[in-house]
From Swiss-Prot:
Protein name per its UniProtKB record: Glycerol kinase
Statement: the UniProt record of this protein carries the keyword Metal-binding: yes
Amino acids binding ADP: 13, 17, 267, 310, 411, 415
Family: Belongs to the FGGY kinase family.
Length: 501
């Protein structure tokens, strides 16, 4: 019998990846392609949907060729994706009517201000689990329909379709036969009622978005359709798992029980805590979102999103030219014993949880004559850990659960300095898994469970090997002293930009 594999497609903010996994959850082959970031105006971020598709489909062909695996050896494909990014395209031609508006894009801040003025904040929080912020898809879709001539009428006639990136990829992979999303992605649109598990008529009405353009919403682990892309001949492969990247990582870390949490250090930082079948309403600026239970069914989670994590290290490299490679940041940070009193607040696109201030801007505080580039590099790394503590404090207050260990993943977890400082500043154990590709793992697990490739999560439990554990190495007084300096710095970076700009 030929060995069968699972493929995870991981469509991220800066690159598209394909990962092949075997039955023991080992990574057999990986392929990755970066694509262009488009910045039409300050604070605006776009992608070309056709380039997203081209990069993702080519990685799929490439990853199979690399491993010398034929398409009939693929048991299923799972998809995980950058969330909230909004795409609108023509049903007939499959052609986008505008670029994808990316989750980081702040262009809809004025639409969000109007929603607040109209007194909708409580309704939105209670029903969608979200805060009013340009981050989510709903206001992005409204912006496209407002600015592309004739598009709203066409959407009403059923000629246009909306989707997050998962929906767009599946539409392309099935040649326009399947228009679908899953609960985790739908819960990020600000258009979805997370309690009724259906699109919210009031939100569609408020944002003037025709229901006809929305995808069908399904659970995260089931067969949605078939694709024969990248295959020799006509082998049809089931597409059987979908989850937004952060929910996929939560599942890949096997945080499927109430009170388990993970933090992903990518472009941004995303901490999620599974709250089981209970949708916990946050009083502390966190999001209530949908996650996956043990067999991909609906569970709820609390989430805190930090917009700038790895992106702030890229800023040190690309704009400030203080390092030539992101990996060098650890070396330079450890050349000094502390930050010499410096705090970097990387609020380049405003602040996420728990502050939610789109008008905050980046700042460096505490500069004195003795500060050198190493101090600034170290302070930038430390800012990632401080922002994570901001989120964890809010999470513990909302859930009433004291976290005993934080599971971590994402590119920046290779940085031992950052992981140790993270443990120091949280006063909590930090667990780094052996397999770092947990987002892809999550998508693969969801797809594999749907087609019976794996029977249940117990089979996967032993795959969750912790490679290294970091334990707090500083005293509580020192920890709190440093953290209070951070809070002071954040306060001063807030509300920098004028509201009416």
């Amino acid at each position: 019998m030929t060995e069968k594999y699972i493929v995870a497609l991981d469509q991220g903010t800066t690159s598209s990846r394909a990962v092949v996994m075997d039955h023991d959850a080992n990574i057999v082959s990986v392929s990755q392609r970066e694509f262009e970031q488009i910045y039409p105006k300050p604070g605006w971020v776009e992608h070309d949907p056709m380039e997203i598709w081209a990069s993702q489909s080519s990685t799929l062909v490439e990853v199979l060729a690399k491993a010398d695996i034929s398409s009939d050896q693929i048991a299923a494909i799972g998809i995980t994706n950058q969330r909230e990014t909004a795409i609108v395209w023509e049903r007939e031609t499959g052609k986008p009517i505008y670029n994808a508006i990316v989750w980081q894009c702040r262009r809809t801040a004025n639409i969000c201000e109007q929603l607040k003025r109209d007194g909708l904040e409580d309704y939105i929080r209670d029903n969608t689990g979200l805060v009013v912020d340009p981050y989510f898809s709903g206001t992005k879709v409204k912006w496209i329909l407002d600015h592309v001539e004739g598009s709203r009428e066409r959407a009403k006639r059923g000629e246009l379709l909306f989707g997050t990136v998962d929906t767009w990829l599946i539409w392309k992979m099935t040649q326009g036969r399947v228009h679908v999303t899953d609960y985790t992605n739908a819960s990020r649109t600000m258009l979805f009622n997370i309690h009724d598990l259906d699109w919210d008529d009031k939100m569609l009405d408020v944002l003037d978005i025709p229901r006809a353009m929305l995808p069908q919403v399904r659970k995260s682990s089931e067969v949605y359709g078939q694709t024969n892309i990248g295959g020799k001949g006509g082998t049809r492969i089931p597409i059987a798992g979908i989850a937004g990247d952060q929910q996929a990582a939560l599942f890949g870390q096997l945080c499927v029980k109430e009170g388990m949490a993970k933090n992903t250090y990518g472009t941004g930082c995303f901490m999620l805590m599974n709250t089981g079948e209970k949708a916990v309403k946050s009083e502390n600026g966190l999001l209530t979102t949908i996650a996956c239970g043990p067999s991909g069914e609906v569970n709820y989670a609390l989430e805190g999103a930090v917009f700038m994590a790895g992106a702030s290290i890229q800023w040190l490299r690309d704009e400030m030219k203080l390092i030539s490679d992101a990996f060098d940041s650890e070396y330079f940070a450890t050349k000094v014993k502390d930050t010499n009193g410096v705090y970097v607040v990387p609020a380049f696109t405003g602040l996420g949880a728990p502050y939610w201030d789109p008008y905050a801007r980046g700042a460096i505080f505490g500069l004195t004559r003795g500060v050198n580039s190493n101090h600034i590099i170290r302070a930038t790394l430390e800012s990632i850990a401080y922002q994570t503590r901001d989120v964890l404090e809010a999470m513990q207050a909302d859930s009433g659960i004291r976290l005993h260990a934080l599971r971590v993943d994402g590119g920046a977890v290779a940085n031992n300095f950052l992981m140790q400082f993270q443990s120091d500043i949280l006063g909590t154990r930090v667990e780094r898994p052996e397999v770092r590709e947990v987002t892809a793992l999550g998508a693969a697990y969801l797809a594999g469970l749907a087609v019976g490739y794996w029977q249940n999560l117990d089979e996967l439990q032993e795959k969750a090997v912790i490679e290294r554990e970091f334990r707090p190495g500083i005293e509580t007084t020192e920890r709190n002293y440093r953290y209070s300096g951070w809070k002071k710095a954040v306060k001063r970076a807030m509300a920098w930009e004028e509201h009416d700009k």
